[in-house]
């Protein structure tokens, strides 16, 4: 009986400790999915960047709001989740399906969906750990404004092939940045 009580106490302490930590451990597969998504996104390119120079635009990716050195790990998970969700919304739209190879688009969206599940699992572990700090809200707002600018750009360009190519390249940079953020967070943990 004493062993059972001791075992239960250890489980409770371990559960409490992991819940109260500054975040969660994303599965190793998250990084693999992110790399695969980047590779597929690169394969989706249909036009050369030179042919779309006239359509290039700086969407103002909020790197300073997503950078691991600026926000803590617990704050970065909701921001990365929102970034991934916005990318999925963009590429899962009916306007997107006409622009890309269906097989590559499905693969890309599936990778994003699996990444969202991983990030959502982290968020569930963080429930109750801390309130949404102002910096996190600023970061989430910056990500949403960034994607609003992308959506407006696509609408203004009538979802042209060059507009989608510009957006594809921009999203590739955003996903690369999110991979770098997670890499720095993992280094800090080690």
Swiss-Prot record:
A single GO cellular-component term from the record reads:
extracellular space
- One short Pfam family name for this protein? Interferon
* Stretch forming the signal peptide: 1-23
- The keyword Glycoprotein belongs to this UniProt entry's keyword annotation: yes
PTM annotation, UniProt: N-glycosylated.
One GO MF term: cytokine receptor binding
Which ranges does the record mark as transmembrane?
Answer: none
The organism's superkingdom is given as Eukaryota
The residues that carry sugar chains are 101
Q: Where is the protein localized?
A: Secreted
Q: Keywords assigned by UniProt? A: Antiviral defense, Cytokine, Disulfide bond, Glycoprotein, Secreted, Signal
GO BP annotation list:
defense response to virus; natural killer cell activation; negative regulation of cell population proliferation
Q: List all disulphide bridges recorded for this chain.
A: 24-122, 52-162
Q: What is its main location?
A: secreted
Against InterPro entries, the record matches this protein to: 4_helix_cytokine-like_core, Interferon_alpha/beta/delta
Membership in a protein family: Belongs to the alpha/beta interferon family.
Which PANTHER family does this UniProt record tie to the protein? INTERFERON ALPHA-5 (PTHR11691:SF60), TYPE I INTERFERON (PTHR11691)
Instruction: Say what the protein does.
Output: Has antiviral and antiproliferative activities. Produced by macrophages and stimulates the production of two enzymes: a protein kinase and an oligoadenylate synthetase. During viral infection, mediates antiviral effect, either directly by inducing interferon-stimulated genes, either indirectly through stimulation of natural killer cells enabling them to control viral replication.
Q: What is this protein called?
A: Interferon alpha-11
**Organism of derivation:** Mus musculus
Its gene is Ifna11
């Amino acid at each position: 009986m004493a062993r059972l009580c001791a075992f239960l106490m250890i489980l409770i302490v371990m559960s409490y400790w992991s819940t109260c930590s500054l975040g969660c451990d994303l599965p190793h597969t998250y990084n693999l999915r992110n790399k695969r998504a980047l590779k597929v996104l690169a394969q989706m390119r249909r036009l050369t960047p030179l042919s779309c120079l006239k359509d290039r635009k700086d969407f103002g990716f909020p790197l300073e709001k997503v950078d691991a050195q600026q926000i803590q790990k617990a704050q970065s998970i909701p921001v990365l989740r929102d970034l991934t969700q916005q990318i999925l919304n963009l590429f899962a739209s009916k306007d997107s399906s006409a622009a890309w190879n269906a097989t590559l688009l499905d693969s890309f969206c599936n990778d994003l969906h699996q990444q969202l599940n991983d990030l959502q699992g982290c968020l569930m572990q963080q429930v109750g750990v801390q309130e949404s700090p102002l910096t996190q809200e600023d970061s989430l707002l910056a990500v949403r404004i960034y994607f609003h600018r992308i959506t407006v750009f696509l609408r203004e360009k009538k979802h042209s092939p060059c507009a989608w190519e510009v957006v594809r390249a921009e999203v590739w940079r955003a996903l690369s940045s999110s991979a770098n953020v997670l890499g720095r967070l993992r280094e800090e943990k080690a």
